[in-house]
Amino acid sequence: MPEHQFTLKNATVVTPDRVIEKGVIDIENGRIKQVREQSDSTPEDRNALDLSGKYIFPGFIDLHVHGGGGGSFNSVDPLDHEKARSYHLQHGTTSMLTTTSTTEFLFLEKVLASLSASAKAPSKGSRVLGIHTEGPFISPKRNGAHHIPLILEGSIELLDRLIFASNGSVSMVTVAPEIRGGLELIRRLISKKIVASLGHSEATFEEATKGIELGATSTTHTFNAMSPLRHREPGMVGAVLDADDIFCEAILDGVHIHPVAFRVLLARKGIDRVNLVTDSTSYAGEGDGKFSRPDGRTLVKEGNRIVIEGSDTLAGSSLNMNLALKNCLKFSGIELHDLSKLASLNAAKIIGLEGDLGSIENGKIADLVVLDANFDTQAVMMEGVWARNDLS
């Protein structure tokens, strides 16, 4: 059999609509040629790799990731970018939106230019599908860990500068719709086919709903840093729960949201409108301790929890997508085929790449994650090539 053709067999293959217990995946030229079920009548292929006892999921897609493995995407150093991409690939993330956070505007332009360039360079890390800019067009009342002096009002001119600096790589922008110029930003993003994601917002129900009506299709880390659901003022949480079509990010590290809140989100939005993200920082994969930020503040990492020193303000996570998937199973007990949607397919739909990515289906790119019985990553494949292979 030529090297560009091979077969994986006897694994539990997780597709969007079913789980194939004795699944076979034929791969050719970096794509999935056929997904089928092993049967006694199937001729034995001695070249096939037997993955008995393993699960095969589609490669995970993370649309909100700031760094990992000691590397940050809020950096102009391509070595930082490579550290983070390599770390997350090892944990099953085959595609991502590299995500920036609020920083000094001129520096942010340089960061975006650097991210765009490094995304095109050879890498041993996750594929970069674009850039998600989280800030600076957010509410100072719901800033989270974003430095208030650097938060800006909505400006078409400044937005266009960021898009230009990124060489058109900006694919998603977090916006608070209620800030001055916020709705104009959403209109501009939609006109440029960039995803507008609502977040870091003190919006009323009406203000958030207006943003959705204008075309916002995503919600940044649902429940976190947004106006909560109250019985007389439903806020942004109420607006995104009430709207049928908008997607909702969820950070499942056991810190950002309670498992019950996640189950409520799933019950209201449905499996097809929730996507798992990490919101991980450069400290993902690092030990506990104190870390200095460029803005002069200190972060404290203890286990899964990262906060600004002297406060309870969360500052991203130390999560990876493999752990998010395991937590999702623990918190919700959903079916495996639904889990694959939350970890992969829904994210691909948000950015319009579901034709090639996000699921194990005939004709799609062969991005795969092999998990053991404990759902720990054993191997990762990108475009039919092993990027990690710990299979015995």
Question: What positions do the PLM features span?
Answer:
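N-terminal metal-binding scaffold of metallo-dependent hydrolase/deaminase domains
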Residues: 1-43, 381
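C-terminal cap of metal-dependent C-N hydrolases
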Residues: 11, 349, 359-392
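Metal-associated gating/positioning segment near the N- to mid-region
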Residues: 51-110
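Charged helix-capping and loop-helix junction motifs
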Residues: 77-80, 111-115, 156-157, 231-237
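Divalent-metal coordination cores built from histidine and acidic residues
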Residues: 85-169
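Conserved, mostly hydrophobic/aromatic
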Residues: 133, 189, 219, 328, ...
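Active-site core of metal-dependent hydrolases
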Residues: 160, 164-287
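His/Asp/Glu-enriched, well-ordered alpha-helical/loop segment
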Residues: 235-250, 254, 266-278, 284-370
